[in-house]
């Protein structure tokens, strides 16, 4: 037992030292002129990621379902300094639409350097699983299969540029969470697919990178509306989150945790003390507001 405690303390000290003393810095000029496709970018985190790339002078293409909001975001991207800003309305519940978006991005941008997969949907409400298969199928299609379809359709262009894939995942893709069974399943699938793909790139000596962003509760309008009265957690800033995601993408880091101290300790302790982790996380839910 003493050995286990010593090991855990050593790991904690190591991660604390890494977190506070890491010196990696992002060269913003390296992004100027790069070609970026960002999905789910009419609002929330995707919108903020688009603005971060715009500030660095990238060519940007954004996509979501709502055309008017896409137009507004594209206009703001140009004001912030984007080299160009394109948009296309699309429903990621249709895999043919996902394929078309990737192909259109490659044509309009003249290639692709960053593929940022951020959209979510189809997983139903926040509550107990009652046997309904529609949310399972919907979530699998939108939150997993469309990501793979976009990657497949953009792969040749990314190979040509030795580009980067950025996957917005969740703590729910590392630790099973109640009330979001369909969503959790899709995020676990993402983690498996893209960690495997990253290894394949490495074995081929490819310079292509895969960055998985493992996120907690972020203060996007959709997230707050869906779970704001059902959890006792404080939502983290979407602007700060976007900056960290883009930094990780530019530095080609394999993964990022945000907020770091709200997620990383639980992921580390999950296998050692699963019961304790579950009890701590379960206390975050306001059960009387969940059906």
Curated annotation (Swiss-Prot):
It is an enzyme of class 1 (oxidoreductase). InterPro entries: 11-beta-HSD, NAD(P)-bd_dom_sf, Sc_DH/Rdtase_CS, SDR_fam. It comes from the Eukaryota. One of its GO terms (molecular function) is oxidoreductase activity. Keywords: NADP, Oxidoreductase, Secreted, Signal. It catalyses: cortisone + NADPH + H(+) = cortisol + NADP(+). CDD domains: 11beta-HSD1_like_SDR_c. NADP(+) binds at residues 40-66, 91-92, 118-120, 183-187, 216-222. Its EC number is 1.1.1.-. Substrate binds at residue 170. Disulfide bonds: none annotated. The active site is at 183 (proton acceptor). GO terms for cellular component: extracellular region; intracellular membrane-bounded organelle. It is found in: Secreted. Residues 1-17 form the signal peptide. It holds the Pfam family adh_short. Unidirectional NADP(+)-dependent cortisol dehydrogenase (in vitro). Belongs to the short-chain dehydrogenases/reductases (SDR) family. This is Hydroxysteroid 11-beta-dehydrogenase 1-like protein B. The lineage of its organism: Eukaryota, Metazoa, Chordata, Craniata, Vertebrata.
């Amino acid at each position: 037992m003493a050995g286990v405690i010593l090991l855990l303390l050593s790991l904690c000290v190591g991660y604390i030292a890494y977190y506070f003393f890491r010196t990696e810095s992002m060269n913003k000029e390296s992004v100027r002129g790069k070609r970026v496709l960002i999905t789910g970018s009419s609002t929330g985190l995707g919108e903020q990621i688009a603005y971060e790339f715009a500030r660095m002078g990238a060519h940007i293409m954004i996509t979501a379902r709502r055309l008017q909001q896409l137009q507004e975001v594209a206009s703001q991207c140009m004001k912030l300094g984007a080299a160009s800003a394109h948009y296309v309305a699309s429903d990621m519940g249709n895999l043919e639409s996902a394929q078309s978006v990737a192909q259109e991005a490659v044509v309009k941008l003249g290639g692709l350097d960053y593929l940022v997969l951020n959209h979510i949907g189809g997983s139903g409400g926040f509550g107990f699983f009652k046997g309904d298969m529609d949310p399972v199928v919907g979530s699998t299609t939108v939150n997993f299969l469309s990501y793979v379809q976009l990657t497949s359709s953009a792969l040749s262009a990314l190979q040509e540029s030795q580009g980067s894939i950025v996957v917005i995942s969740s703590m729910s893709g590392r630790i099973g969470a109640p009330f979001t069974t369909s969503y959790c399943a899709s995020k676990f699938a993402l983690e498996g697919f893209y960690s495997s793909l990253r290894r394949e790139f490495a074995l081929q000596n490819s310079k292509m990178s895969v960055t998985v962003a493992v996120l907690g509760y972020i203060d996007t309008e959709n997230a707050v509306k869906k779970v704001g009265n059902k959890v006792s957690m404080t939502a983290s800033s979407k602007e700060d989150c976007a900056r960290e995601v883009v930094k990780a993408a530019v530095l080609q880091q394999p993964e990022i945790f945000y907020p770091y101290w709200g997620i990383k300790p639980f992921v580390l302790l999950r296998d050692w003390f699963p019961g304790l982790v579950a009890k701590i996380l379960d206390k975050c839910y306001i059960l009387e507001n969940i059906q």
